[in-house]
């Protein structure tokens, strides 16, 4: 895929780490990296409009193949003119393969060489997803960046199981490449798996790099391992990937994990974290996490985060946000979601500047001293 519609341009390497400043060029525009991608599971980033996403600096969003396949259906979206037109988003879109959702949401899974049979979590009907079908759905969706269909072994599964799993994922990746109908306007990434085993990650990366994908995803992390274990896997995995292609760490959204991923050479991240926790009143601030629903904020007439200049922090107080959330008002969720997304997008903007200034390690130290550091590795 050397004539891929997805191009990575390296602008600068940070002197003291593996971090890199760059940009990714797609058919729907160019975005700077490192970048956090908000997740629009059902073709919408929950409670946020496309205009708000652009306002907060989101250069690309992610949508979920599994959910859109089940509802409203990829063929309907194709008839609407593709996902960009359907959801009125004219900037880049990345879609996952549906694999992770099949393994985490669906019941009664049965994995064979052909693909995965499972029960639809909405109505219980029996369904089948193969590498070819995953590509076909994404071709219908028309995303700029698509993912290969992979198996997602858990981090602590036995070596022999993980070895068989990555070998199958490599065969599935090859099948997906052959099934890809739109290589001229949709890039396709391979997904490196291998749990915590360095030799299996090496084997997986070697297989996929030989297939010349548009970019490479690092899967199977942020699934229960410690922060230290995730960093160790990233330390050796990013070294196995080509410098002229994008690197995407899947499902990671905790601020300290984003910075640590960038330090190890990752360009792209996604996670439902900012909008999911916002719905419960949990907000990311420069001083750490804050649960604005708590009683202590009932008469706190200060901004959510005095150091933040987002729409929420410029206009509303903690007391008002608490009132909205306690009253189950949707506007409260809109405001906390906006803030959390802005916080992560602004963090990545600061990280990009720190790479430019060659002081990313100092920035990390300063950030973690105020925000805190999550050793467990849980996305929070």
From Swiss-Prot:
It comes from Streptococcus pneumoniae (strain 70585). Belongs to the queuine tRNA-ribosyltransferase family. One of its GO terms (cellular component) is cytosol. Catalyzes the base-exchange of a guanine (G) residue with the queuine precursor 7-aminomethyl-7-deazaguanine (PreQ1) at position 34 (anticodon wobble position) in tRNAs with GU(N) anticodons (tRNA-Asp, -Asn, -His and -Tyr). Catalysis occurs through a double-displacement mechanism. The nucleophile active site attacks the C1' of nucleotide 34 to detach the guanine base from the RNA, forming a covalent enzyme-RNA intermediate. The proton acceptor active site deprotonates the incoming PreQ1, allowing a nucleophilic attack on the C1' of the ribose to form the product. GO terms for biological process: queuosine biosynthetic process; tRNA wobble guanine modification; tRNA-guanine transglycosylation. Substrate binds at residues 96-100, 150, 193, 220. The gene is tgt. The keyword Ubl conjugation does not apply. It is an enzyme of class 2 (transferase). Homodimer. Within each dimer, one monomer is responsible for RNA recognition and catalysis, while the other monomer binds to the replacement base PreQ1. This is Queuine tRNA-ribosyltransferase. Its cofactor is Zn(2+).
């Amino acid at each position: 895929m050397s004539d891929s519609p997805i191009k990575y341009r390296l602008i600068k390497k940070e002197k003291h780490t593996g971090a890199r400043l760059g940009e990714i060029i797609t058919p729907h525009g160019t975005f700077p990296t490192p970048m956090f991608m908000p997740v629009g599971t059902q073709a919408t980033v929950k409670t946020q409009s496309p205009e708000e996403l652009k306002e907060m600096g989101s250069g690309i969003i992610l949508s979920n193949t599994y959910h859109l396949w089940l509802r409203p259906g990829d063929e309907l979206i194709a008839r609407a003119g593709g996902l960009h037109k359907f959801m009125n988003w004219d900037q880049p879109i990345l879609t996952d393969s549906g694999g992770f959702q099949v393994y985490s949401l669906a019941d009664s899974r049965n994995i064979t060489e052909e693909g995965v049979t499972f029960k639809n979590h909405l109505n219980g009907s029996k369904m089948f997803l193969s590498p070819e079908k995953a590509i076909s759905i994404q071709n219908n969706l028309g995303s700029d960046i698509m993912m290969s269909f992979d198996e997602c072994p858990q981090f602590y599964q036995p070596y022999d199981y993980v070895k068989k799993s990555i070998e199958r994922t490599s065969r599935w990746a090859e099948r997906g490449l052959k099934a890809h109908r739109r290589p001229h306007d949709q890039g396709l990434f391979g997904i490196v798996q291998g749990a915590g085993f360095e030799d299996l990650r090496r084997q997986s990366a070697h297989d996929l790099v030989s297939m010349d994908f548009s970019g490479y995803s690092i899967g199977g992390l942020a699934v229960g391992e410690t922060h230290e274990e995730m960093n160790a896997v990233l330390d050796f995995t990013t070294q196995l990937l080509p410098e002229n292609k994008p690197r995407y760490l899947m499902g990671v959204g905790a601020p300290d994990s984003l910075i640590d991923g960038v330090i190890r050479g990752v360009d792209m991240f996604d996670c439902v974290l900012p909008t999911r926790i916002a719905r419960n009143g949990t907000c990311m601030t420069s001083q750490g996490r804050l649960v604005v629903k708590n009683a202590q904020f009932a008469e706190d007439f200060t901004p959510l985060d005095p150091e933040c200049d987002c729409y929420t922090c410029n206009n509303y107080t903690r007391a008002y946000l608490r009132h909205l959330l306690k009253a189950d008002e949707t506007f409260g969720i809109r405001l906390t979601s906006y803030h959390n997304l802005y916080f992560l997008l602004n963090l990545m903007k600061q990280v990009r500047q720190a790479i430019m200034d060659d002081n990313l390690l100092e920035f990390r130290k300063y950030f973690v001293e105020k925000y805190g550091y999550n050793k467990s590795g849980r996305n929070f």
